[in-house]
Amino acid sequence: MDDERMLLLSLSQIEGLGNKAKKALLFHFGSAIRVFSCTEREVKGLLFLSEREKDALMSGLKEPVPKNIIESLKSYEISFVTVKDSEYPALLLDVYNPPFIIFYRGTLPKANEECVAMVGARRCSAYGKKASLALSSLLAKNGISVVSGLALGIDGFSHEGALSQGGRTYAFLGCGVDLCYPASHEDLFERITKNGAVMSEFPPGTKPLKNNFPVRNRLISGLSKRVVIVEAAEKSGSLITADFALEQGREVYVFPGRYDDPLSRGTNKLIYQGAGVILSPEEFVSDLLSIKDTALSFTGGTVKGKTRNLEDDEAIVYSCLDFYPKGFERLSTETGLPLLSLISAVMRLCDRGLVMETFKNEYVKV
């Protein structure tokens, strides 16, 4: 591990500094090495940090990475990726408060890997089990990866279905990746590391505390363009994932259920609020594949002709845009362009009819 990565790990573990502050420090100083060599006078002059954050930074600069974390990385073969790394899952840059660092065991998703998130009730019904196994196995059979949270019930069956077809699946944990929670999923945990990854923003040694799980839900939806709520009661934690998905501009789908079934009240309510309905796993996957084919066809014909005379910065921005929304923060990271140049290029692409704004300050290819 080189000095920069070691210091990025150290920066990630400074208590009292949020992800936003850590990224701002990297942007300001240019590298973790420079952050850790800054003087007290420089810290006091940082206008984007509060006095409390400045104190936290000064304390953190004196402390190396905790030995227990280093030992866990080695003992459990844990890797990590930071927001500064090209391997960092790009979709996660769109989530609220993107993790500064992600610890994982296994292999990260590829840049253009298609993922669908699947979540639902822990104490699911036979119907929920059947639906989650059927959909996840069919997704995997067609080369689409499954993202979930390793919980009992729908989460576990979603991972199992993907693995049954030799597919890839990813689990975001509410604890460190050196721990398997629940313990009964230890075998599933190990199989996921060989056909995907178990991932967490929490450092090794973090216990599965109750408050960690709603926080990690934003990453389950964030890693996917589409989120499926298989089965959920009226106050299910899965509805938190649905809320995050909507905030992130993701599509939300549900399996419908009987009106008098407590485990379908949450999903049926989402239908009432406008969520997509999955009439069958086959139809849902068929629609996904047709959307994928349509997106690929946009690279030819009229659009291709319109992109021939783009300015350099316009071409860079256009190549980074996709058919799902991206915001300026993510585009800035992907393109490396100064913010003003980026905004100007996006506006010109909008004027040309190549790009459109779908949400406030979020853009897609047309």
Model-found features: residue ranges?
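Short, positively charged patches
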Residues: 1-141
